[in-house]
């Protein structure tokens, strides 16, 4: 029995010794620092066996996405790495880079800069990138300052260059390559194209090409146009009583193309058709093309006139006034054969319209005159409908005496700015007159033919006269504007023979 116990004890000792031999030490547990040039994410995943890893040196590795992912998932490990840019390796927290031309390509540069989150300045001396390529960099990195220089005309110039002299070059020498370089100078504000002797190697079409490329730069340039010296700085260009004709339009267009400061281009009686000039004006709205229109032999005005006063005209004769889009005051009254005011459609600024004693039948063209304040339709017996005036919400005064065809004035009730409505001799029912007084409490509605002093017709109290029998101030102002006391009509001051 004693022998069996001894054997059991021996076996137990042997088992204990065997068990102690199974607890072999793991050397990976001792790894706290590690250096590796990783090829990909898989190589970094293998590092997970080092559970006690504290520092990891990955300099020389190019798998930046994998490195950044590893850092995010292993905050306990201090990782050191670098980023290869144009053949040189930089710490990922680098703030400034200076890259020599020829050491980088745009796509590779854009890709690698994603891994430089603290980069704030990029220096590119003598860069070979184009303006469009530089714009791509700025678009992808809007907070990045990009400074660069370019080689231009044998010199190295900075992107902040503001002035350049091209007067010594020919138009042919300003080729596409040079144009691309110029486009890389966003701060360029002045380009000299005139030599000291006042000559230039550039034609207007060449200047236009430069302006298209450098929209923010002023071109210092002058040229001859129909015997007149014109400069790109001119704000006004005027030609008067000079035969230019329709054939001169291409030259005029070439000039307007390079006159960015011109706000007034006058072609007064230059033998150019109205339709041609209207198209020119439409194509160059900023230049305000102005010309003279003629009608019925004795009348003529510039197209930018604000006042027109003429009488005894026909509708077809004043059709030419459609080119006068700035008219504010229009008197075409006392015209027995005037049957349309279609022309006012083209006068959006019109405030006063006088078409008394005419055969007009339709007021709808006034729909395009939202600023209309005064309307005189005295003795316009063919008018029947006032509804188009509903759109003229700024109307203050209407004289419709002897407009016998009008029997309904209810469309006027909505015109809350009305101050005077003179009905005079008319076919408006008495009940409607009273209703108008109620519906338009702020308007002086008058249907009297004459006042107690015997003042006659449209001079009656309630229109041109105040209650005291004196001329109203608004009418005195209009007399001056239309120059009634001078018996003025448009074109009277200056007799001009129209060039054709």
What are these regions (language model features)?
Residues 70, 436:
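Major-groove DNA-contacting interfaces characterized by cationic-aromatic clusters
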Residues 29-43, 49-65, 74-108, 112, ...:
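Concave beta-strand-loop units of leucine-rich repeat
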Residues 1-9:
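Bacterial N-terminal signal peptides that target proteins for export
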Residues 18-21:
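C-terminal motif of bacterial Sec signal peptides marking the signal peptidase cleavage site
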Residues 23-27:
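Bacterial lipoprotein signal-peptidase II cleavage site
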């Amino acid at each position: 029995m004693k022998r069996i116990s001894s054997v059991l004890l021996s076996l137990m000792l042997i088992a204990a010794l065997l068990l102690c031999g199974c607890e072999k030490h793991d050397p990976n547990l001792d790894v706290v620092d590690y250096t590796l040039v990783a090829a990909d994410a898989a190589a970094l995943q293998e590092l997970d066996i080092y559970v006690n890893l504290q520092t990891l040196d990955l300099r020389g590795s190019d798998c930046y996405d994998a490195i950044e992912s590893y850092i995010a998932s292993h905050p306990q490990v201090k990782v050191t790495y670098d980023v290869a840019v144009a053949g040189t390796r930089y710490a990922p927290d680098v703030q400034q880079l200076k890259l020599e031309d020829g050491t980088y390509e745009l796509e590779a540069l854009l890709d690698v800069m994603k891994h430089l989150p603290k980069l704030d300045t990029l220096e590119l001396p003598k860069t070979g990138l184009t303006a469009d390529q530089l714009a791509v960099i700025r678009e992808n990195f809007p907070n990045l300052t990009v400074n660069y220089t370019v080689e231009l005309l044998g010199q190295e110039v900075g992107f902040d260059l503001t002035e350049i002299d091209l007067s010594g070059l020919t138009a042919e020498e300003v080729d596409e390559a040079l144009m691309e370089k110029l486009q890389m100078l966003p701060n360029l504000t002045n380009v000299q194209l005139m030599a000291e002797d006042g000559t230039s190697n550039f034609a207007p079409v060449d200047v236009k090409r430069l302006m298209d490329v450098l929209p923010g730069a002023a071109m210092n340039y002058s040229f001859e146009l129909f015997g007149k010296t014109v400069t790109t700085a001119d704000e006004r260009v005027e030609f008067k009583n000079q035969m230019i004709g329709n054939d001169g339009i291409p030259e005029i267009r070439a000039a307007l193309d390079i006159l960015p400061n011109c706000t007034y281009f006058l072609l007064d009686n230059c033998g150019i058709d109205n339709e041609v000039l209207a198209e020119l004006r439409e194509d160059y709205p900023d230049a305000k093309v102005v010309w003279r229109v003629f009608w019925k032999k004795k009348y003529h005005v510039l197209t930018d006139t604000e006042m027109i006063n003429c009488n005894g005209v026909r509708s077809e004769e004043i059709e030419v006034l459609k080119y006068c889009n700035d008219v504010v005051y229009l008197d075409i009254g006392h015209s027995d054969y005037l049957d349309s005011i279609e022309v006012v459609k083209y006068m959006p600024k019109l405030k006063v319209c006088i078409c008394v004693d005419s055969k007009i039948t339709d007021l709808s063209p006034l729909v395009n005159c939202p600023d209309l304040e005064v309307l005189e339709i005295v003795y316009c017996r063919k008018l029947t409908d006032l509804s188009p005036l509903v759109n003229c919400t700024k109307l203050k005064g209407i004289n419709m005496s002897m407009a016998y065809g009008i029997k309904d004035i209810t469309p006027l009730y909505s015109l809350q700015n009305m101050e005077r409505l003179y009905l005079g001799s008319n076919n408006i029912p008495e009940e409607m007159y009273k209703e108008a007084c109620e519906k338009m409490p702020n308007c002086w509605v008058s249907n009297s033919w004459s006042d107690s002093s015997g003042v006659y017709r449209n001079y009656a109290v309630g229109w041109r006269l105040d209650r005291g029998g004196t001329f109203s101030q608004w009418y005195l102002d209009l007399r001056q504007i239309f120059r009634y006391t001078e018996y003025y009509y448009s074109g009277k001051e200056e007799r001009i023979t129209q060039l054709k």
